Amino acid sequence: MVGYKEKKPEILNKLKSGYPRFVRHQRINVLSKYWNRQKPEAPNETFFFSNPKDWDFAQNILKISEAEVEQQEKYLIVHIPGRSKDCAKLHKFFQHAGVGLSSRHAETILDSLGILSIGESVTPNLAAEDDIKSIISKAHGPQVSPEDVLLTISGANAFTSVFRAALIQAKQQQKKLWVRLGWLYLDTIEIMDLLVENQAQIIDLNHPDEFYKLEEIFNTYGQDIAGIVTEFPSNPLLHSCDLVKVRQLCDQHNALLIVDPTMASPKNAKVTTLSDVVINSLTKYANWEGDVMMGSVVFPTHSDKGMALKMTVSEMITCPFHKDMERMAEQIPYYDNFIDRTNQSQLEIVEYLNSHPKIKRVYWAYQQSTGKNYRNIAGDDKPGCVVSFEVKGSFTNFYNALGMLKSPSFGTEFSLCCPYVYLAHYKMVTSESGLKILNHAGLSTELLRLSVGLEEPEEIKESLDQALKLC
Protein backbone atom coordinates (compact mmCIF):
# COMPACT_ATOMS: atom_id res chain seq x y z
CA MET A 1 0.00 0.00 0.00
CA VAL A 2 2.84 2.40 0.83
CA GLY A 3 4.54 1.42 -2.43
CA TYR A 4 1.35 2.30 -4.30
CA LYS A 5 1.13 5.72 -2.66
CA GLU A 6 4.81 6.37 -3.43
CA LYS A 7 4.20 5.26 -7.02
CA LYS A 8 6.91 2.61 -7.02
CA PRO A 9 6.98 0.98 -10.49
CA GLU A 10 7.37 -2.55 -9.11
CA ILE A 11 4.09 -2.11 -7.23
CA LEU A 12 2.14 -0.16 -9.86
CA ASN A 13 3.05 -2.69 -12.56
CA LYS A 14 1.36 -5.43 -10.53
CA LEU A 15 -1.78 -3.38 -9.90
CA LYS A 16 -4.23 -4.60 -12.53
CA SER A 17 -7.36 -2.95 -11.13
CA GLY A 18 -8.51 -0.64 -8.37
CA TYR A 19 -11.10 1.93 -7.36
CA PRO A 20 -11.86 3.61 -10.73
CA ARG A 21 -11.21 7.21 -9.68
CA PHE A 22 -7.77 6.19 -8.37
CA VAL A 23 -6.70 3.44 -10.78
CA ARG A 24 -7.52 3.63 -14.48
CA HIS A 25 -9.51 0.61 -15.66
CA GLN A 26 -7.88 -1.79 -18.14
CA ARG A 27 -10.57 -1.10 -20.75
CA ILE A 28 -9.72 2.61 -20.66
CA ASN A 29 -6.01 1.77 -20.88
CA VAL A 30 -6.66 -0.28 -24.03
CA LEU A 31 -8.61 2.59 -25.56
CA SER A 32 -5.83 5.01 -24.65
CA LYS A 33 -3.20 2.81 -26.30
CA TYR A 34 -5.33 2.61 -29.45
CA TRP A 35 -5.54 6.38 -29.81
CA ASN A 36 -1.88 6.86 -28.90
CA ARG A 37 -0.93 4.54 -31.76
CA GLN A 38 -2.73 6.91 -34.12
CA LYS A 39 -0.24 9.61 -33.07
CA PRO A 40 3.06 7.80 -32.55
CA GLU A 41 5.08 10.97 -33.09
CA ALA A 42 3.82 12.61 -29.87
CA PRO A 43 4.52 11.08 -26.40
CA ASN A 44 1.17 12.18 -25.06
CA GLU A 45 -1.12 10.94 -22.34
CA THR A 46 -4.72 10.55 -23.42
CA PHE A 47 -7.79 11.54 -21.41
CA PHE A 48 -11.41 10.77 -22.26
CA PHE A 49 -14.51 12.81 -21.45
CA SER A 50 -17.99 11.37 -21.87
CA ASN A 51 -19.32 14.92 -21.48
CA PRO A 52 -17.49 17.66 -23.49
CA LYS A 53 -18.66 20.21 -20.91
CA ASP A 54 -16.35 18.56 -18.38
CA TRP A 55 -13.36 19.41 -20.57
CA ASP A 56 -14.54 23.01 -20.83
CA PHE A 57 -14.80 23.10 -17.04
CA ALA A 58 -11.35 21.54 -16.58
CA GLN A 59 -9.77 23.88 -19.12
CA ASN A 60 -11.34 26.90 -17.49
CA ILE A 61 -10.28 26.07 -13.95
CA LEU A 62 -6.91 24.41 -14.59
CA LYS A 63 -5.72 26.76 -17.36
CA ILE A 64 -4.18 23.90 -19.34
CA SER A 65 -1.82 25.37 -21.91
CA GLU A 66 -0.99 22.41 -24.17
CA ALA A 67 -3.80 20.14 -25.28
CA GLU A 68 -4.90 18.55 -28.53
CA VAL A 69 -8.64 17.88 -28.58
CA GLU A 70 -10.55 15.43 -30.79
CA GLN A 71 -14.34 15.22 -30.79
CA GLN A 72 -15.62 11.71 -31.45
CA GLU A 73 -19.27 10.85 -31.92
CA LYS A 74 -20.09 10.26 -28.26
CA TYR A 75 -16.95 11.24 -26.36
CA LEU A 76 -14.06 13.68 -26.34
CA ILE A 77 -10.35 12.84 -26.51
CA VAL A 78 -7.76 15.17 -25.00
CA HIS A 79 -4.05 14.59 -25.61
CA ILE A 80 -1.69 16.17 -23.06
CA PRO A 81 2.14 15.97 -23.13
CA GLY A 82 3.11 13.06 -20.88
CA ARG A 83 4.77 13.80 -17.52
CA SER A 84 3.85 17.49 -17.82
CA LYS A 85 2.37 19.63 -15.05
CA ASP A 86 -0.84 19.88 -17.06
CA CYS A 87 -0.99 16.09 -17.22
CA ALA A 88 -0.61 15.78 -13.44
CA LYS A 89 -3.24 18.47 -12.86
CA LEU A 90 -5.74 16.73 -15.13
CA HIS A 91 -5.21 13.37 -13.41
CA LYS A 92 -6.04 15.02 -10.07
CA PHE A 93 -9.03 16.76 -11.61
CA PHE A 94 -10.44 13.44 -12.86
CA GLN A 95 -10.14 11.99 -9.35
CA HIS A 96 -11.59 14.93 -7.43
CA ALA A 97 -14.34 15.92 -9.90
CA GLY A 98 -15.37 12.33 -10.68
CA VAL A 99 -15.51 12.71 -14.47
CA GLY A 100 -14.32 10.65 -17.47
CA LEU A 101 -15.42 7.40 -19.08
CA SER A 102 -16.72 4.39 -17.22
CA SER A 103 -15.22 0.99 -18.07
CA ARG A 104 -18.50 -0.09 -19.71
CA HIS A 105 -18.49 3.03 -21.86
CA ALA A 106 -14.88 2.33 -22.88
CA GLU A 107 -15.74 -1.31 -23.62
CA THR A 108 -18.62 -0.23 -25.87
CA ILE A 109 -16.29 2.08 -27.79
CA LEU A 110 -13.69 -0.68 -28.15
CA ASP A 111 -16.40 -2.99 -29.45
CA SER A 112 -17.42 -0.39 -32.06
CA LEU A 113 -13.77 -0.09 -33.14
CA GLY A 114 -13.52 -3.86 -33.54
CA ILE A 115 -10.78 -4.13 -30.92
CA LEU A 116 -12.64 -6.40 -28.52
CA SER A 117 -16.16 -7.64 -27.98
CA ILE A 118 -18.32 -6.91 -24.98
CA GLY A 119 -17.89 -9.72 -22.47
CA GLU A 120 -20.41 -8.72 -19.83
CA SER A 121 -24.06 -9.63 -20.05
CA VAL A 122 -26.32 -6.90 -18.66
CA THR A 123 -30.10 -7.04 -18.90
CA PRO A 124 -31.32 -4.34 -21.33
CA ASN A 125 -33.65 -1.99 -19.49
CA LEU A 126 -35.06 1.17 -21.03
CA ALA A 127 -36.57 2.03 -17.65
CA ALA A 128 -33.30 1.63 -15.72
CA GLU A 129 -33.02 5.31 -14.78
CA ASP A 130 -36.62 5.39 -13.57
CA ASP A 131 -36.13 2.19 -11.57
CA ILE A 132 -33.07 3.62 -9.80
CA LYS A 133 -34.70 6.97 -9.08
CA SER A 134 -37.81 5.28 -7.70
CA ILE A 135 -35.91 3.26 -5.10
CA ILE A 136 -33.48 6.05 -4.20
CA SER A 137 -36.27 8.58 -3.74
CA LYS A 138 -38.06 6.20 -1.35
CA ALA A 139 -34.83 5.73 0.60
CA HIS A 140 -34.66 9.47 1.24
CA GLY A 141 -38.16 9.53 2.70
CA PRO A 142 -41.79 10.12 1.71
CA GLN A 143 -41.12 13.80 0.98
CA VAL A 144 -38.96 12.89 -2.04
CA SER A 145 -40.27 11.80 -5.45
CA PRO A 146 -38.29 10.38 -8.40
CA GLU A 147 -38.53 13.80 -10.10
CA ASP A 148 -36.47 15.27 -7.24
CA VAL A 149 -33.49 12.98 -8.05
CA LEU A 150 -30.64 13.52 -10.52
CA LEU A 151 -28.24 10.66 -11.33
CA THR A 152 -24.56 11.36 -11.98
CA ILE A 153 -21.53 9.45 -13.23
CA SER A 154 -20.12 9.34 -9.67
CA GLY A 155 -20.71 10.67 -6.18
CA ALA A 156 -17.79 13.06 -6.64
CA ASN A 157 -19.44 14.42 -9.79
CA ALA A 158 -22.65 14.93 -7.83
CA PHE A 159 -20.92 17.05 -5.20
CA THR A 160 -18.76 18.95 -7.70
CA SER A 161 -21.80 19.93 -9.76
CA VAL A 162 -23.78 21.06 -6.72
CA PHE A 163 -20.91 23.08 -5.28
CA ARG A 164 -20.23 24.77 -8.63
CA ALA A 165 -23.87 25.82 -8.81
CA ALA A 166 -23.85 26.90 -5.16
CA LEU A 167 -20.83 29.15 -5.77
CA ILE A 168 -22.71 30.90 -8.58
CA GLN A 169 -25.69 31.38 -6.27
CA ALA A 170 -23.44 32.67 -3.48
CA LYS A 171 -21.76 35.16 -5.80
CA GLN A 172 -25.14 36.54 -6.83
CA GLN A 173 -26.00 36.92 -3.14
CA GLN A 174 -22.55 38.47 -2.43
CA LYS A 175 -21.73 35.74 0.10
CA LYS A 176 -18.14 34.57 0.38
CA LEU A 177 -17.86 32.28 3.38
CA TRP A 178 -18.30 28.49 3.54
CA VAL A 179 -18.08 26.18 6.53
CA ARG A 180 -16.93 22.56 6.34
CA LEU A 181 -18.52 20.94 9.36
CA GLY A 182 -16.66 17.79 10.39
CA TRP A 183 -13.77 16.11 8.62
CA LEU A 184 -15.01 15.56 5.08
CA TYR A 185 -14.01 13.05 2.43
CA LEU A 186 -10.72 13.83 0.65
CA ASP A 187 -12.18 14.65 -2.76
CA THR A 188 -14.84 16.90 -1.24
CA ILE A 189 -12.10 18.87 0.52
CA GLU A 190 -9.93 19.03 -2.60
CA ILE A 191 -12.65 20.10 -5.05
CA MET A 192 -13.91 22.78 -2.67
CA ASP A 193 -10.39 24.18 -2.33
CA LEU A 194 -9.91 24.07 -6.10
CA LEU A 195 -13.21 25.77 -6.95
CA VAL A 196 -13.12 28.44 -4.26
CA GLU A 197 -9.64 29.79 -5.12
CA ASN A 198 -9.69 33.50 -4.24
CA GLN A 199 -13.42 34.12 -4.59
CA ALA A 200 -14.43 32.77 -1.17
CA GLN A 201 -13.12 31.64 2.20
CA ILE A 202 -13.56 28.27 3.89
CA ILE A 203 -13.68 27.73 7.65
CA ASP A 204 -12.97 24.18 8.82
CA LEU A 205 -14.53 22.79 11.98
CA ASN A 206 -12.93 19.37 11.74
CA HIS A 207 -13.61 17.88 15.17
CA PRO A 208 -16.82 17.58 17.24
CA ASP A 209 -15.08 19.55 20.00
CA GLU A 210 -15.23 22.51 17.59
CA PHE A 211 -18.86 22.18 16.53
CA TYR A 212 -20.00 24.64 19.21
CA LYS A 213 -18.07 27.34 17.33
CA LEU A 214 -20.57 27.21 14.47
CA GLU A 215 -23.06 29.39 16.33
CA GLU A 216 -20.28 31.88 17.13
CA ILE A 217 -19.31 31.97 13.46
CA PHE A 218 -22.89 32.69 12.43
CA ASN A 219 -23.18 35.38 15.10
CA THR A 220 -19.97 36.99 13.84
CA TYR A 221 -20.33 36.67 10.07
CA GLY A 222 -24.10 36.24 9.70
CA GLN A 223 -25.25 37.10 6.20
CA ASP A 224 -21.75 36.56 4.73
CA ILE A 225 -22.09 32.78 5.16
CA ALA A 226 -23.01 31.14 1.86
CA GLY A 227 -23.48 27.67 3.23
CA ILE A 228 -22.51 24.63 5.27
CA VAL A 229 -21.18 21.37 3.86
CA THR A 230 -21.33 18.34 6.14
CA GLU A 231 -21.42 14.55 6.06
CA PHE A 232 -23.88 12.76 8.31
CA PRO A 233 -22.08 10.83 9.65
CA SER A 234 -18.55 11.81 8.62
CA ASN A 235 -15.87 9.80 6.86
CA PRO A 236 -13.98 8.04 8.45
CA LEU A 237 -14.77 8.80 12.12
CA LEU A 238 -18.57 8.60 11.80
CA HIS A 239 -19.15 11.85 13.70
CA SER A 240 -22.54 13.56 13.40
CA CYS A 241 -23.34 17.20 14.01
CA ASP A 242 -26.54 18.47 15.63
CA LEU A 243 -28.27 18.73 12.27
CA VAL A 244 -31.44 20.25 13.73
CA LYS A 245 -29.41 23.10 15.24
CA VAL A 246 -27.41 23.57 12.04
CA ARG A 247 -30.67 23.80 10.07
CA GLN A 248 -31.95 26.49 12.44
CA LEU A 249 -28.76 28.54 12.06
CA CYS A 250 -28.88 28.24 8.28
CA ASP A 251 -32.51 29.37 8.23
CA GLN A 252 -31.77 32.36 10.47
CA HIS A 253 -29.01 33.55 8.14
CA ASN A 254 -30.30 32.33 4.75
CA ALA A 255 -27.40 29.90 4.29
CA LEU A 256 -27.43 26.77 2.14
CA LEU A 257 -27.10 23.37 3.84
CA ILE A 258 -25.54 20.57 1.75
CA VAL A 259 -25.59 17.16 3.45
CA ASP A 260 -24.04 13.84 2.40
CA PRO A 261 -25.40 10.77 4.28
CA THR A 262 -23.45 8.23 2.18
CA MET A 263 -21.52 6.69 5.09
CA ALA A 264 -24.67 5.26 6.66
CA SER A 265 -26.91 5.54 3.56
CA PRO A 266 -29.88 7.91 3.11
CA LYS A 267 -32.17 5.00 4.02
CA ASN A 268 -30.69 4.99 7.53
CA ALA A 269 -29.83 8.67 7.95
CA LYS A 270 -33.03 10.47 6.93
CA VAL A 271 -31.51 13.93 6.49
CA THR A 272 -33.76 15.16 3.67
CA THR A 273 -36.21 17.19 5.76
CA LEU A 274 -33.30 19.19 7.22
CA SER A 275 -31.25 19.65 4.02
CA ASP A 276 -31.35 21.99 1.05
CA VAL A 277 -29.47 19.51 -1.14
CA VAL A 278 -28.58 15.86 -0.43
CA ILE A 279 -25.51 14.26 -2.05
CA ASN A 280 -25.16 10.47 -2.19
CA SER A 281 -22.66 8.06 -3.70
CA LEU A 282 -24.64 5.16 -5.14
CA THR A 283 -21.33 3.34 -5.59
CA LYS A 284 -21.93 2.37 -1.97
CA TYR A 285 -24.89 0.27 -0.74
CA ALA A 286 -26.92 0.59 -3.98
CA ASN A 287 -24.05 -1.00 -5.93
CA TRP A 288 -23.62 -3.74 -3.36
CA GLU A 289 -21.90 -6.06 -5.84
CA GLY A 290 -19.16 -3.47 -6.28
CA ASP A 291 -18.97 -2.94 -10.04
CA VAL A 292 -20.70 0.39 -10.83
CA MET A 293 -19.78 4.02 -10.19
CA MET A 294 -22.74 6.38 -9.74
CA GLY A 295 -24.02 9.24 -7.64
CA SER A 296 -27.24 11.08 -6.95
CA VAL A 297 -28.39 14.57 -6.03
CA VAL A 298 -31.73 15.04 -4.29
CA PHE A 299 -33.51 18.41 -4.17
CA PRO A 300 -36.09 18.43 -1.36
CA THR A 301 -39.13 20.37 -2.57
CA HIS A 302 -39.48 22.14 0.79
CA SER A 303 -36.22 24.02 0.14
CA ASP A 304 -36.46 27.07 -2.12
CA LYS A 305 -32.68 27.51 -1.90
CA GLY A 306 -32.08 23.95 -3.04
CA MET A 307 -34.69 24.00 -5.78
CA ALA A 308 -33.16 27.23 -7.11
CA LEU A 309 -30.02 25.23 -7.89
CA LYS A 310 -31.69 22.30 -9.62
CA MET A 311 -31.69 23.60 -13.19
CA THR A 312 -28.05 24.74 -13.03
CA VAL A 313 -26.94 21.46 -11.46
CA SER A 314 -28.81 19.44 -14.09
CA GLU A 315 -26.82 21.27 -16.78
CA MET A 316 -23.49 20.67 -15.00
CA ILE A 317 -23.72 16.98 -14.09
CA THR A 318 -22.42 14.16 -16.25
CA CYS A 319 -25.10 11.49 -16.57
CA PRO A 320 -24.24 7.80 -16.11
CA PHE A 321 -23.62 5.66 -19.19
CA HIS A 322 -26.74 3.68 -20.08
CA LYS A 323 -25.10 0.28 -19.48
CA ASP A 324 -24.02 1.43 -16.02
CA MET A 325 -27.61 2.37 -15.25
CA GLU A 326 -28.78 -1.02 -16.52
CA ARG A 327 -26.24 -2.76 -14.29
CA MET A 328 -27.27 -0.64 -11.31
CA ALA A 329 -30.93 -1.44 -12.03
CA GLU A 330 -30.08 -5.15 -11.68
CA GLN A 331 -28.72 -4.60 -8.16
CA ILE A 332 -30.83 -1.86 -6.66
CA PRO A 333 -33.97 -3.96 -5.96
CA TYR A 334 -31.92 -5.52 -3.12
CA TYR A 335 -30.86 -2.12 -1.70
CA ASP A 336 -33.20 -2.13 1.31
CA ASN A 337 -32.45 -5.72 2.22
CA PHE A 338 -28.70 -5.18 1.95
CA ILE A 339 -28.84 -2.22 4.32
CA ASP A 340 -31.08 -4.02 6.81
CA ARG A 341 -28.75 -7.03 6.92
CA THR A 342 -25.55 -5.03 7.27
CA ASN A 343 -27.14 -2.89 9.99
CA GLN A 344 -27.70 -6.02 12.07
CA SER A 345 -24.26 -7.46 11.35
CA GLN A 346 -22.62 -4.15 12.21
CA LEU A 347 -24.18 -4.15 15.67
CA GLU A 348 -22.52 -7.52 16.35
CA ILE A 349 -19.15 -6.42 14.96
CA VAL A 350 -19.11 -3.23 17.04
CA GLU A 351 -19.93 -5.22 20.18
CA TYR A 352 -17.05 -7.58 19.35
CA LEU A 353 -14.59 -4.72 18.76
CA ASN A 354 -15.62 -2.84 21.90
CA SER A 355 -15.02 -5.93 24.03
CA HIS A 356 -11.70 -7.01 22.47
CA PRO A 357 -8.60 -6.34 24.61
CA LYS A 358 -6.47 -5.45 21.57
CA ILE A 359 -8.79 -2.73 20.29
CA LYS A 360 -7.86 0.77 21.43
CA ARG A 361 -10.76 2.84 20.06
CA VAL A 362 -13.93 2.25 18.07
CA TYR A 363 -15.69 4.89 15.97
CA TRP A 364 -19.21 4.22 14.72
CA ALA A 365 -22.47 6.07 14.16
CA TYR A 366 -23.68 5.63 17.75
CA GLN A 367 -20.40 6.43 19.50
CA GLN A 368 -20.67 8.32 22.78
CA SER A 369 -19.33 11.67 21.55
CA THR A 370 -21.90 12.37 18.81
CA GLY A 371 -24.15 9.32 18.76
CA LYS A 372 -27.12 11.20 20.18
CA ASN A 373 -27.08 13.52 17.16
CA TYR A 374 -27.16 10.54 14.82
CA ARG A 375 -29.87 8.78 16.84
CA ASN A 376 -32.07 11.89 16.70
CA ILE A 377 -32.20 11.53 12.92
CA ALA A 378 -31.81 7.78 12.26
CA GLY A 379 -33.36 6.22 15.34
CA ASP A 380 -31.92 3.04 16.85
CA ASP A 381 -30.14 0.06 15.28
CA LYS A 382 -29.36 1.72 11.93
CA PRO A 383 -25.58 2.23 12.02
CA GLY A 384 -24.82 1.49 8.38
CA CYS A 385 -22.01 -0.88 7.44
CA VAL A 386 -18.92 1.18 8.37
CA VAL A 387 -16.94 1.16 11.61
CA SER A 388 -13.44 2.55 12.14
CA PHE A 389 -11.03 1.44 14.85
CA GLU A 390 -7.47 1.49 16.17
CA VAL A 391 -5.54 -1.49 17.48
CA LYS A 392 -3.33 -1.53 20.58
CA GLY A 393 -0.65 -3.69 19.00
CA SER A 394 1.16 -3.41 15.67
CA PHE A 395 -1.01 -1.68 13.08
CA THR A 396 1.25 -3.00 10.30
CA ASN A 397 1.15 -6.60 11.49
CA PHE A 398 -2.62 -6.52 11.87
CA TYR A 399 -3.25 -5.08 8.43
CA ASN A 400 -0.81 -7.38 6.65
CA ALA A 401 -2.26 -10.44 8.40
CA LEU A 402 -5.91 -9.56 7.90
CA GLY A 403 -7.53 -12.14 5.62
CA MET A 404 -10.00 -9.73 4.08
CA LEU A 405 -10.28 -7.72 0.87
CA LYS A 406 -8.40 -4.41 1.17
CA SER A 407 -10.18 -1.52 -0.55
CA PRO A 408 -10.98 2.21 -0.18
CA SER A 409 -14.66 1.60 -0.91
CA PHE A 410 -17.49 0.40 1.32
CA GLY A 411 -21.08 -0.77 1.14
CA THR A 412 -20.46 -4.02 -0.75
CA GLU A 413 -21.54 -7.62 -0.18
CA PHE A 414 -17.94 -8.55 0.68
CA SER A 415 -16.33 -7.01 3.75
CA LEU A 416 -13.55 -4.50 3.08
CA CYS A 417 -10.85 -2.97 5.23
CA CYS A 418 -8.43 -0.13 4.55
CA PRO A 419 -5.83 1.97 6.40
CA TYR A 420 -7.92 5.05 5.66
CA VAL A 421 -5.54 7.87 6.54
CA TYR A 422 -2.65 6.33 4.61
CA LEU A 423 -4.86 5.91 1.55
CA ALA A 424 -6.68 9.23 1.61
CA HIS A 425 -4.13 11.57 3.19
CA TYR A 426 -0.68 10.09 2.53
CA LYS A 427 0.90 13.51 1.93
CA MET A 428 -0.25 14.57 5.38
CA VAL A 429 1.06 11.38 6.94
CA THR A 430 4.53 12.11 5.54
CA SER A 431 4.79 15.78 6.60
CA GLU A 432 5.01 17.46 9.99
CA SER A 433 2.40 20.08 9.12
CA GLY A 434 0.05 17.41 7.79
CA LEU A 435 0.39 15.34 10.94
CA LYS A 436 -0.57 18.38 13.02
CA ILE A 437 -3.75 18.84 10.98
CA LEU A 438 -4.63 15.15 11.30
CA ASN A 439 -3.97 15.18 15.03
CA HIS A 440 -6.14 18.27 15.48
CA ALA A 441 -8.96 16.47 13.66
CA GLY A 442 -8.55 13.39 15.87
CA LEU A 443 -7.38 11.25 12.96
CA SER A 444 -4.78 8.64 13.88
CA THR A 445 -2.48 7.61 11.05
CA GLU A 446 -3.12 4.03 12.17
CA LEU A 447 -6.88 4.23 11.78
CA LEU A 448 -8.52 1.23 10.12
CA ARG A 449 -11.89 1.49 8.40
CA LEU A 450 -14.01 -1.65 8.09
CA SER A 451 -17.00 -2.10 5.80
CA VAL A 452 -19.16 -4.99 6.99
CA GLY A 453 -20.48 -7.18 4.18
CA LEU A 454 -23.01 -9.98 3.85
CA GLU A 455 -20.80 -12.69 5.32
CA GLU A 456 -22.00 -14.17 8.58
CA PRO A 457 -20.85 -11.96 11.48
CA GLU A 458 -18.96 -14.91 12.99
CA GLU A 459 -16.92 -15.23 9.80
CA ILE A 460 -15.99 -11.53 9.91
CA LYS A 461 -15.09 -11.76 13.59
CA GLU A 462 -12.92 -14.80 12.91
CA SER A 463 -10.95 -12.89 10.26
CA LEU A 464 -10.44 -9.98 12.65
CA ASP A 465 -9.55 -12.30 15.51
CA GLN A 466 -6.83 -14.11 13.56
CA ALA A 467 -5.18 -10.81 12.60
CA LEU A 468 -5.48 -9.36 16.11
CA LYS A 469 -3.61 -12.38 17.49
CA LEU A 470 -0.62 -11.36 15.36
CA CYS A 471 -0.54 -7.63 16.09
Across the structure, where does each feature detected by a protein language model lie?
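Conserved PLP-enzyme active-site core in the AAT-like
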Residues: 148-358
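Short beta-strand/turn micro-motifs at beta-sheet edges
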Residues: 375, 435-439
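Pyridoxal 5′-phosphate
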Residues: 450
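C-terminal alpha-helix
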Residues: 463-471
